[in-house]
Protein backbone atom coordinates (compact mmCIF):
# COMPACT_ATOMS: atom_id res chain seq x y z
CA UNK A 1 0.00 0.00 0.00
CA UNK A 2 2.90 2.36 0.72
CA UNK A 3 4.21 1.64 -2.80
CA UNK A 4 0.90 2.68 -4.33
CA UNK A 5 0.76 5.91 -2.34
CA UNK A 6 4.35 6.79 -3.19
CA UNK A 7 3.82 6.26 -6.90
CA UNK A 8 0.56 8.17 -6.94
CA UNK A 9 1.85 11.30 -5.19
CA UNK A 10 3.71 12.24 -8.35
CA UNK A 11 0.54 12.21 -10.46
CA UNK A 12 -2.13 13.57 -8.15
CA UNK A 13 -1.24 17.24 -8.58
CA UNK A 14 -0.90 17.00 -12.36
CA UNK A 15 -3.38 14.33 -13.40
CA UNK A 16 -6.22 15.00 -10.92
CA UNK A 17 -6.23 11.40 -9.68
CA UNK A 18 -6.33 10.00 -13.22
CA UNK A 19 -5.27 6.38 -13.37
CA UNK A 20 -4.84 6.19 -17.14
CA UNK A 21 -1.14 7.31 -17.22
CA UNK A 22 -0.21 4.43 -14.91
CA UNK A 23 -0.85 1.90 -17.68
CA UNK A 24 2.32 3.20 -19.37
CA UNK A 25 4.54 2.78 -16.28
CA UNK A 26 6.84 -0.20 -15.99
CA UNK A 27 6.62 -0.47 -12.20
CA UNK A 28 2.90 -1.28 -12.42
CA UNK A 29 3.70 -4.48 -14.30
CA UNK A 30 6.51 -5.18 -11.85
CA UNK A 31 4.00 -4.99 -8.99
CA UNK A 32 1.65 -7.31 -10.88
CA UNK A 33 4.54 -9.69 -11.51
CA UNK A 34 5.49 -9.75 -7.80
CA UNK A 35 1.90 -10.40 -6.79
CA UNK A 36 1.73 -13.23 -9.31
CA UNK A 37 4.66 -14.89 -7.59
CA UNK A 38 3.00 -14.55 -4.18
CA UNK A 39 -0.48 -15.71 -5.18
CA UNK A 40 -2.33 -18.38 -3.26
CA UNK A 41 -1.43 -22.05 -3.62
CA UNK A 42 -5.00 -22.79 -4.69
CA UNK A 43 -4.61 -20.62 -7.81
CA UNK A 44 -2.60 -22.19 -10.56
CA UNK A 45 0.31 -20.17 -11.87
CA UNK A 46 -0.17 -20.12 -15.62
CA UNK A 47 3.40 -19.17 -16.46
CA UNK A 48 3.11 -15.39 -16.51
CA UNK A 49 6.12 -15.02 -14.21
CA UNK A 50 8.20 -17.28 -16.47
CA UNK A 51 7.43 -15.52 -19.77
CA UNK A 52 7.44 -11.90 -18.64
CA UNK A 53 10.55 -9.79 -18.93
CA UNK A 54 11.45 -6.12 -18.94
CA UNK A 55 12.05 -6.23 -22.69
CA UNK A 56 8.55 -7.56 -23.38
CA UNK A 57 7.00 -4.90 -21.13
CA UNK A 58 8.97 -2.11 -22.84
CA UNK A 59 7.88 -3.40 -26.24
CA UNK A 60 4.26 -3.52 -25.07
CA UNK A 61 4.36 0.05 -23.72
CA UNK A 62 5.93 1.36 -26.92
CA UNK A 63 3.12 -0.22 -28.93
CA UNK A 64 0.52 1.33 -26.66
CA UNK A 65 2.09 4.76 -27.18
CA UNK A 66 1.36 4.43 -30.89
CA UNK A 67 -2.21 5.63 -30.83
CA UNK A 68 -3.04 4.28 -34.28
CA UNK A 69 -3.11 0.81 -32.78
CA UNK A 70 -5.91 1.85 -30.43
CA UNK A 71 -8.29 2.60 -33.31
CA UNK A 72 -10.52 -0.41 -33.76
CA UNK A 73 -13.30 -0.72 -36.27
CA UNK A 74 -16.36 -2.58 -35.08
CA UNK A 75 -16.79 -4.27 -38.46
CA UNK A 76 -13.12 -5.04 -38.86
CA UNK A 77 -11.97 -5.88 -35.34
CA UNK A 78 -10.38 -9.15 -36.42
CA UNK A 79 -7.84 -7.31 -38.58
CA UNK A 80 -6.42 -5.31 -35.69
CA UNK A 81 -2.80 -6.39 -35.14
CA UNK A 82 -2.08 -4.49 -31.96
CA UNK A 83 -0.54 -7.48 -30.23
CA UNK A 84 0.65 -9.38 -33.26
CA UNK A 85 1.57 -12.97 -32.57
CA UNK A 86 1.88 -12.50 -28.79
CA UNK A 87 -1.79 -11.72 -28.29
CA UNK A 88 -2.34 -14.09 -25.36
CA UNK A 89 0.81 -13.05 -23.51
CA UNK A 90 0.24 -9.32 -24.02
CA UNK A 91 -3.41 -9.56 -23.03
CA UNK A 92 -2.40 -11.40 -19.88
CA UNK A 93 0.23 -8.79 -18.97
CA UNK A 94 -2.18 -5.89 -19.55
CA UNK A 95 -4.97 -7.55 -17.57
CA UNK A 96 -2.64 -8.14 -14.61
CA UNK A 97 -1.37 -4.57 -14.73
CA UNK A 98 -4.81 -3.06 -15.19
CA UNK A 99 -6.12 -5.08 -12.23
CA UNK A 100 -3.40 -3.54 -10.03
CA UNK A 101 -4.32 -0.05 -11.26
CA UNK A 102 -8.05 -0.45 -10.66
CA UNK A 103 -7.40 -1.84 -7.18
CA UNK A 104 -5.68 1.41 -6.16
CA UNK A 105 -8.88 3.45 -5.48
CA UNK A 106 -10.32 0.61 -3.40
CA UNK A 107 -7.11 0.23 -1.39
CA UNK A 108 -6.76 3.96 -0.78
CA UNK A 109 -10.39 4.19 0.30
CA UNK A 110 -9.89 1.36 2.80
CA UNK A 111 -6.75 2.98 4.26
CA UNK A 112 -8.42 6.39 4.58
CA UNK A 113 -11.48 4.90 6.25
CA UNK A 114 -9.32 3.07 8.76
CA UNK A 115 -7.41 6.27 9.57
CA UNK A 116 -10.61 8.21 10.12
CA UNK A 117 -12.38 5.70 12.33
CA UNK A 118 -9.28 4.12 13.92
CA UNK A 119 -11.41 1.05 14.55
CA UNK A 120 -12.30 -1.80 12.28
CA UNK A 121 -15.99 -2.60 12.20
CA UNK A 122 -16.27 -6.34 12.41
CA UNK A 123 -19.54 -6.58 10.52
CA UNK A 124 -17.88 -5.10 7.45
CA UNK A 125 -14.95 -7.52 7.50
CA UNK A 126 -16.60 -10.86 8.17
CA UNK A 127 -14.81 -13.93 6.92
CA UNK A 128 -16.43 -16.44 4.62
CA UNK A 129 -15.96 -18.93 7.44
CA UNK A 130 -18.55 -17.09 9.53
CA UNK A 131 -21.14 -18.99 7.51
CA UNK A 132 -20.61 -22.00 9.78
CA UNK A 133 -21.56 -20.17 13.03
CA UNK A 134 -24.51 -18.73 11.11
CA UNK A 135 -25.78 -22.21 10.33
CA UNK A 136 -25.16 -23.47 13.85
CA UNK A 137 -26.55 -20.51 15.81
CA UNK A 138 -29.09 -18.62 13.68
CA UNK A 139 -30.32 -21.07 11.09
CA UNK A 140 -32.30 -23.28 13.53
CA UNK A 141 -34.40 -20.24 14.56
CA UNK A 142 -35.50 -19.43 11.00
CA UNK A 143 -38.52 -20.79 9.14
CA UNK A 144 -37.93 -20.12 5.44
CA UNK A 145 -34.83 -19.98 3.26
CA UNK A 146 -33.97 -19.43 -0.40
CA UNK A 147 -30.73 -20.39 -2.11
CA UNK A 148 -30.23 -17.78 -4.85
CA UNK A 149 -27.63 -18.05 -7.59
CA UNK A 150 -26.33 -14.52 -8.20
CA UNK A 151 -26.80 -13.94 -11.94
CA UNK A 152 -23.92 -12.86 -14.12
CA UNK A 153 -24.33 -9.81 -16.36
CA UNK A 154 -24.97 -10.84 -19.93
CA UNK A 155 -22.83 -7.96 -21.21
CA UNK A 156 -19.34 -6.95 -20.11
CA UNK A 157 -20.31 -3.28 -20.36
CA UNK A 158 -22.37 -3.70 -17.17
CA UNK A 159 -19.24 -4.79 -15.31
CA UNK A 160 -17.37 -1.76 -16.61
CA UNK A 161 -20.15 0.62 -15.56
CA UNK A 162 -20.04 -0.61 -11.97
CA UNK A 163 -16.50 0.74 -11.69
CA UNK A 164 -17.46 4.30 -12.59
CA UNK A 165 -18.50 5.07 -9.00
CA UNK A 166 -14.99 4.41 -7.70
CA UNK A 167 -12.84 5.04 -10.77
CA UNK A 168 -13.47 8.66 -11.82
CA UNK A 169 -11.14 8.43 -14.79
CA UNK A 170 -13.05 8.05 -18.10
CA UNK A 171 -9.85 7.24 -19.98
CA UNK A 172 -9.22 4.19 -17.82
CA UNK A 173 -12.77 2.96 -18.34
CA UNK A 174 -12.48 3.45 -22.10
CA UNK A 175 -9.22 1.54 -22.09
CA UNK A 176 -10.90 -1.31 -20.22
CA UNK A 177 -13.68 -1.38 -22.81
CA UNK A 178 -11.07 -1.43 -25.56
CA UNK A 179 -9.24 -4.28 -23.92
CA UNK A 180 -12.37 -6.39 -23.46
CA UNK A 181 -13.55 -5.62 -26.98
CA UNK A 182 -10.23 -6.69 -28.47
CA UNK A 183 -9.73 -9.98 -26.67
CA UNK A 184 -13.16 -11.30 -25.84
CA UNK A 185 -16.41 -11.90 -27.62
CA UNK A 186 -18.30 -8.84 -26.43
CA UNK A 187 -21.74 -10.48 -26.62
CA UNK A 188 -20.78 -13.79 -25.02
CA UNK A 189 -22.65 -14.80 -21.92
CA UNK A 190 -20.27 -14.83 -18.97
CA UNK A 191 -20.24 -18.11 -17.08
CA UNK A 192 -17.95 -19.26 -14.25
CA UNK A 193 -16.42 -21.97 -16.42
CA UNK A 194 -15.56 -19.63 -19.30
CA UNK A 195 -14.02 -16.20 -19.59
CA UNK A 196 -14.75 -14.64 -16.20
CA UNK A 197 -12.72 -17.27 -14.35
CA UNK A 198 -10.18 -17.87 -17.10
CA UNK A 199 -6.86 -18.71 -15.49
CA UNK A 200 -4.92 -16.25 -17.64
CA UNK A 201 -7.05 -13.25 -16.61
CA UNK A 202 -8.49 -14.37 -13.32
CA UNK A 203 -7.41 -11.35 -11.29
CA UNK A 204 -9.02 -8.75 -13.56
CA UNK A 205 -12.31 -10.55 -14.00
CA UNK A 206 -12.60 -11.35 -10.31
CA UNK A 207 -12.12 -7.65 -9.63
CA UNK A 208 -14.89 -6.76 -12.09
CA UNK A 209 -17.19 -9.42 -10.68
CA UNK A 210 -16.54 -8.39 -7.08
CA UNK A 211 -17.29 -4.76 -7.91
CA UNK A 212 -20.56 -5.91 -9.47
CA UNK A 213 -21.48 -7.90 -6.36
CA UNK A 214 -20.44 -5.01 -4.11
CA UNK A 215 -22.71 -2.68 -6.08
CA UNK A 216 -25.61 -5.10 -5.73
CA UNK A 217 -25.08 -5.74 -2.02
CA UNK A 218 -24.48 -2.12 -1.05
CA UNK A 219 -28.00 -1.17 -2.11
CA UNK A 220 -29.63 -4.40 -0.96
CA UNK A 221 -28.08 -4.35 2.51
CA UNK A 222 -28.76 -0.64 2.96
CA UNK A 223 -32.45 -1.23 2.38
CA UNK A 224 -32.35 -4.31 4.57
CA UNK A 225 -30.67 -2.50 7.47
CA UNK A 226 -32.80 0.63 7.14
CA UNK A 227 -36.11 -1.15 6.60
CA UNK A 228 -37.50 0.21 9.86
CA UNK A 229 -36.92 3.80 8.67
CA UNK A 230 -37.93 3.54 5.02
CA UNK A 231 -41.71 3.72 5.01
CA UNK A 232 -42.00 4.78 1.37
CA UNK A 233 -39.72 3.95 -1.50
CA UNK A 234 -39.68 3.35 -5.22
CA UNK A 235 -37.61 1.31 -7.61
CA UNK A 236 -36.88 4.51 -9.53
CA UNK A 237 -34.53 5.66 -6.79
CA UNK A 238 -32.34 2.61 -7.38
CA UNK A 239 -31.66 3.21 -11.06
CA UNK A 240 -28.76 5.57 -10.46
CA UNK A 241 -26.53 5.04 -7.47
CA UNK A 242 -24.93 8.49 -7.57
CA UNK A 243 -28.31 10.17 -7.36
CA UNK A 244 -29.32 7.70 -4.68
CA UNK A 245 -26.46 8.66 -2.36
CA UNK A 246 -27.01 12.35 -2.99
CA UNK A 247 -30.61 12.10 -1.91
CA UNK A 248 -30.06 10.14 1.29
CA UNK A 249 -28.28 13.16 2.76
CA UNK A 250 -31.73 14.71 3.18
CA UNK A 251 -34.73 13.36 5.09
CA UNK A 252 -35.52 10.10 3.33
CA UNK A 253 -39.29 10.14 3.68
CA UNK A 254 -39.55 13.74 2.49
CA UNK A 255 -37.44 13.09 -0.60
CA UNK A 256 -39.35 9.95 -1.51
CA UNK A 257 -42.74 11.62 -0.97
CA UNK A 258 -41.89 14.72 -2.99
CA UNK A 259 -39.86 13.29 -5.86
CA UNK A 260 -41.60 9.96 -6.37
CA UNK A 261 -45.38 10.21 -6.12
CA UNK A 262 -45.87 6.69 -7.43
CA UNK A 263 -44.60 4.75 -4.45
CA UNK A 264 -45.03 1.37 -2.89
CA UNK A 265 -44.89 0.32 0.71
CA UNK A 266 -41.60 -1.21 1.69
CA UNK A 267 -41.91 -4.49 3.52
CA UNK A 268 -40.42 -4.62 7.00
CA UNK A 269 -38.79 -7.83 8.17
CA UNK A 270 -36.37 -7.49 11.10
CA UNK A 271 -35.62 -11.22 10.98
CA UNK A 272 -34.29 -11.38 7.43
CA UNK A 273 -30.80 -12.90 7.14
CA UNK A 274 -28.50 -12.56 4.15
CA UNK A 275 -25.40 -14.68 3.51
CA UNK A 276 -23.24 -14.88 0.39
CA UNK A 277 -20.77 -17.59 -0.55
CA UNK A 278 -19.19 -18.73 -3.83
CA UNK A 279 -21.49 -16.90 -6.21
CA UNK A 280 -24.62 -17.81 -4.28
CA UNK A 281 -26.64 -16.02 -1.64
CA UNK A 282 -28.91 -17.35 1.08
CA UNK A 283 -31.95 -15.35 2.07
CA UNK A 284 -33.61 -16.67 5.22
CA UNK A 285 -36.39 -15.31 7.40
CA UNK A 286 -38.29 -16.13 10.55
CA UNK A 287 -41.42 -14.38 9.33
CA UNK A 288 -44.23 -15.43 7.00
CA UNK A 289 -43.76 -16.72 3.43
CA UNK A 290 -45.48 -13.56 2.15
CA UNK A 291 -42.46 -11.45 3.07
CA UNK A 292 -40.11 -14.00 1.52
CA UNK A 293 -42.06 -13.75 -1.73
CA UNK A 294 -41.78 -9.96 -1.60
CA UNK A 295 -38.01 -10.20 -1.21
CA UNK A 296 -37.93 -12.71 -4.05
CA UNK A 297 -39.72 -10.46 -6.53
CA UNK A 298 -37.80 -7.44 -5.30
CA UNK A 299 -34.52 -9.17 -6.17
CA UNK A 300 -35.81 -10.16 -9.61
CA UNK A 301 -36.94 -6.62 -10.45
CA UNK A 302 -33.79 -5.16 -8.94
CA UNK A 303 -31.50 -7.25 -11.17
CA UNK A 304 -33.61 -6.58 -14.24
CA UNK A 305 -33.98 -2.82 -13.74
CA UNK A 306 -30.59 -1.90 -12.30
CA UNK A 307 -28.25 -4.38 -14.00
CA UNK A 308 -30.37 -5.34 -17.02
CA UNK A 309 -29.99 -8.99 -16.07
CA UNK A 310 -32.89 -11.24 -16.98
CA UNK A 311 -33.67 -13.54 -14.08
CA UNK A 312 -36.66 -15.87 -13.87
CA UNK A 313 -38.58 -15.82 -10.56
CA UNK A 314 -39.15 -19.56 -10.85
CA UNK A 315 -35.45 -20.19 -10.25
CA UNK A 316 -35.73 -18.86 -6.68
CA UNK A 317 -37.33 -21.53 -4.51
CA UNK A 318 -38.59 -20.73 -1.02
CA UNK A 319 -38.09 -23.74 1.24
CA UNK A 320 -39.88 -24.28 4.52
CA UNK A 321 -37.06 -25.61 6.65
CA UNK A 322 -39.25 -27.80 8.86
CA UNK A 323 -40.59 -29.73 5.84
CA UNK A 324 -37.96 -29.55 3.11
CA UNK A 325 -34.20 -30.03 2.98
CA UNK A 326 -31.92 -27.18 2.02
CA UNK A 327 -28.90 -27.78 -0.19
CA UNK A 328 -25.75 -26.17 1.21
CA UNK A 329 -22.22 -27.03 0.03
CA UNK A 330 -23.31 -30.55 -0.85
CA UNK A 331 -25.10 -31.11 2.48
CA UNK A 332 -28.85 -31.61 2.89
CA UNK A 333 -29.74 -29.24 5.73
CA UNK A 334 -33.07 -29.19 7.52
CA UNK A 335 -34.59 -28.12 10.82
CA UNK A 336 -36.30 -30.74 12.96
CA UNK A 337 -37.98 -30.33 16.35
CA UNK A 338 -36.21 -31.87 19.31
CA UNK A 339 -38.81 -32.43 22.02
CA UNK A 340 -37.66 -33.11 25.57
CA UNK A 341 -39.99 -33.88 28.47
CA UNK A 342 -39.35 -32.09 31.76
CA UNK A 343 -41.08 -33.08 35.02
CA UNK A 344 -41.90 -30.12 37.26
CA UNK A 345 -43.33 -30.19 40.76
CA UNK A 346 -45.12 -27.35 42.52
CA UNK A 347 -45.96 -28.17 46.15
CA UNK A 348 -47.97 -31.38 45.97
CA UNK A 349 -48.78 -31.17 42.27
CA UNK A 350 -46.43 -32.49 39.61
CA UNK A 351 -46.83 -32.13 35.89
CA UNK A 352 -44.95 -32.78 32.68
CA UNK A 353 -43.78 -30.06 30.31
CA UNK A 354 -42.81 -30.56 26.69
CA UNK A 355 -39.83 -28.42 25.81
CA UNK A 356 -39.64 -28.18 22.02
CA UNK A 357 -36.34 -27.01 20.56
CA UNK A 358 -35.27 -26.82 16.93
CA UNK A 359 -32.16 -28.67 15.89
CA UNK A 360 -30.11 -28.33 12.72
CA UNK A 361 -29.63 -31.52 10.74
CA UNK A 362 -26.89 -31.68 8.11
CA UNK A 363 -27.28 -34.94 6.24
CA UNK A 364 -24.95 -36.76 3.91
CA UNK A 365 -26.50 -36.95 0.38
CA UNK A 366 -26.36 -40.72 0.07
CA UNK A 367 -28.38 -41.15 -3.15
CA UNK A 368 -26.46 -38.56 -5.25
CA UNK A 369 -23.19 -39.91 -3.88
CA UNK A 370 -24.04 -43.48 -4.90
CA UNK A 371 -24.91 -42.15 -8.34
CA UNK A 372 -21.52 -40.43 -8.54
CA UNK A 373 -19.69 -43.60 -7.46
CA UNK A 374 -21.65 -45.62 -10.02
CA UNK A 375 -20.67 -43.18 -12.75
CA UNK A 376 -16.95 -43.76 -12.07
CA UNK A 377 -17.46 -47.55 -11.74
CA UNK A 378 -16.97 -48.07 -7.99
CA UNK A 379 -20.44 -49.61 -7.64
CA UNK A 380 -23.62 -50.16 -9.61
CA UNK A 381 -26.69 -47.94 -9.46
CA UNK A 382 -28.03 -49.95 -6.51
CA UNK A 383 -24.91 -49.30 -4.43
CA UNK A 384 -23.43 -52.79 -4.78
CA UNK A 385 -19.59 -52.54 -4.87
CA UNK A 386 -17.77 -53.64 -8.02
CA UNK A 387 -14.12 -53.81 -8.95
CA UNK A 388 -12.38 -50.85 -10.55
CA UNK A 389 -11.08 -52.62 -13.64
CA UNK A 390 -9.09 -49.65 -14.95
CA UNK A 391 -6.90 -49.69 -11.82
CA UNK A 392 -6.15 -53.42 -11.89
CA UNK A 393 -2.81 -52.86 -13.65
CA UNK A 394 -1.45 -50.67 -10.83
CA UNK A 395 0.54 -51.92 -7.87
CA UNK A 396 -1.21 -53.06 -4.69
CA UNK A 397 0.02 -50.11 -2.67
CA UNK A 398 -1.07 -47.68 -5.37
CA UNK A 399 -4.56 -49.18 -5.51
CA UNK A 400 -4.94 -49.06 -1.74
CA UNK A 401 -3.61 -45.49 -1.56
CA UNK A 402 -6.12 -44.31 -4.16
CA UNK A 403 -9.10 -45.81 -2.37
CA UNK A 404 -7.90 -44.61 1.03
CA UNK A 405 -7.37 -41.10 -0.33
CA UNK A 406 -10.91 -40.97 -1.75
CA UNK A 407 -12.41 -42.23 1.50
CA UNK A 408 -10.33 -39.80 3.54
CA UNK A 409 -11.37 -36.84 1.39
CA UNK A 410 -15.05 -37.74 1.74
CA UNK A 411 -14.68 -38.13 5.51
CA UNK A 412 -12.91 -34.79 5.71
CA UNK A 413 -15.46 -32.94 3.59
CA UNK A 414 -18.56 -34.46 5.20
CA UNK A 415 -17.32 -34.32 8.79
CA UNK A 416 -20.05 -31.73 9.36
CA UNK A 417 -22.75 -34.36 8.96
CA UNK A 418 -24.93 -34.75 12.01
CA UNK A 419 -25.50 -38.41 11.14
CA UNK A 420 -22.52 -40.43 9.95
CA UNK A 421 -24.31 -43.67 9.08
CA UNK A 422 -24.65 -42.81 5.38
CA UNK A 423 -21.01 -41.75 5.25
CA UNK A 424 -19.95 -45.10 6.71
CA UNK A 425 -21.97 -46.85 4.00
CA UNK A 426 -20.04 -45.01 1.29
CA UNK A 427 -16.75 -45.94 2.95
CA UNK A 428 -17.96 -49.54 3.10
CA UNK A 429 -18.62 -49.43 -0.67
CA UNK A 430 -15.12 -48.09 -1.26
CA UNK A 431 -13.58 -50.73 0.97
CA UNK A 432 -15.26 -53.64 -0.82
CA UNK A 433 -14.51 -52.09 -4.20
CA UNK A 434 -10.86 -51.92 -3.20
CA UNK A 435 -10.87 -55.59 -2.13
CA UNK A 436 -12.59 -56.68 -5.35
CA UNK A 437 -10.09 -54.71 -7.42
CA UNK A 438 -7.15 -56.38 -5.65
CA UNK A 439 -8.79 -59.80 -5.92
CA UNK A 440 -9.36 -59.29 -9.63
CA UNK A 441 -5.75 -58.30 -10.11
CA UNK A 442 -4.51 -61.45 -8.34
CA UNK A 443 -7.21 -63.62 -9.99
CA UNK A 444 -8.66 -64.66 -6.67
CA UNK A 445 -11.94 -64.44 -4.79
CA UNK A 446 -12.65 -61.78 -2.19
CA UNK A 447 -12.90 -64.33 0.65
CA UNK A 448 -9.62 -66.00 -0.26
CA UNK A 449 -7.83 -62.68 -0.68
CA UNK A 450 -8.96 -61.40 2.73
CA UNK A 451 -7.97 -64.64 4.46
CA UNK A 452 -4.50 -64.47 2.95
CA UNK A 453 -3.75 -60.84 3.85
CA UNK A 454 -5.84 -60.47 7.02
CA UNK A 455 -8.16 -57.66 8.19
CA UNK A 456 -5.36 -55.16 8.84
CA UNK A 457 -5.18 -54.44 5.13
CA UNK A 458 -8.19 -52.12 5.25
CA UNK A 459 -7.77 -50.55 8.68
CA UNK A 460 -6.62 -47.33 7.03
CA UNK A 461 -10.17 -46.65 5.86
CA UNK A 462 -11.39 -46.11 9.41
CA UNK A 463 -8.40 -44.99 11.48
CA UNK A 464 -7.64 -41.56 10.00
CA UNK A 465 -10.22 -39.58 11.99
CA UNK A 466 -9.55 -41.52 15.19
CA UNK A 467 -5.84 -40.69 14.91
CA UNK A 468 -6.60 -36.98 14.49
CA UNK A 469 -8.87 -36.85 17.52
CA UNK A 470 -6.48 -38.92 19.63
CA UNK A 471 -3.88 -36.18 19.06
CA UNK A 472 -6.37 -33.49 20.08
CA UNK A 473 -7.72 -35.37 23.12
CA UNK A 474 -5.04 -37.86 24.19
CA UNK A 475 -6.39 -38.53 27.70
CA UNK A 476 -10.15 -38.14 27.58
CA UNK A 477 -11.68 -41.07 25.74
CA UNK A 478 -15.24 -39.91 26.49
CA UNK A 479 -14.52 -36.53 24.91
CA UNK A 480 -12.98 -38.28 21.93
CA UNK A 481 -16.08 -40.40 21.37
CA UNK A 482 -18.43 -37.45 21.80
CA UNK A 483 -16.54 -35.28 19.31
CA UNK A 484 -16.09 -38.11 16.85
CA UNK A 485 -19.85 -38.67 16.71
CA UNK A 486 -20.67 -34.95 16.58
CA UNK A 487 -20.54 -32.39 13.81
CA UNK A 488 -17.19 -30.80 12.99
CA UNK A 489 -16.69 -28.22 10.24
CA UNK A 490 -13.33 -28.07 8.48
CA UNK A 491 -12.81 -24.58 7.09
CA UNK A 492 -11.10 -25.69 3.89
CA UNK A 493 -14.25 -27.36 2.53
CA UNK A 494 -15.24 -23.96 1.12
CA UNK A 495 -12.13 -23.95 -1.07
CA UNK A 496 -12.68 -27.59 -2.03
CA UNK A 497 -16.27 -26.91 -3.04
CA UNK A 498 -15.24 -23.82 -5.01
CA UNK A 499 -12.60 -25.74 -6.98
CA UNK A 500 -15.05 -28.55 -7.76
CA UNK A 501 -17.68 -26.10 -9.04
CA UNK A 502 -15.30 -24.28 -11.39
CA UNK A 503 -13.30 -27.15 -12.85
Curated annotation (Swiss-Prot):
An example Gene Ontology biological process: mRNA processing
Assigned keywords, A-Z: Chloroplast, mRNA processing, Plastid, RNA-binding, tRNA processing
Places the protein is found: Plastid, Chloroplast
Principal place of residence: plastid
A cellular component term, taken from the record's GO annotations: chloroplast
Pfam families: Intron_maturas2, MatK_N
Keyword Chloroplast among UniProt keywords: yes
Single Gene Ontology MF annotation: RNA binding
Family (UniProt): Belongs to the intron maturase 2 family. MatK subfamily.
Protein task: Usually encoded in the trnK tRNA gene intron. Probably assists in splicing its own and other chloroplast group II introns.
Protein name: Maturase K
Originating organism: Rosa rugosa (Rugosa rose)
Gene expressing this chain: matK
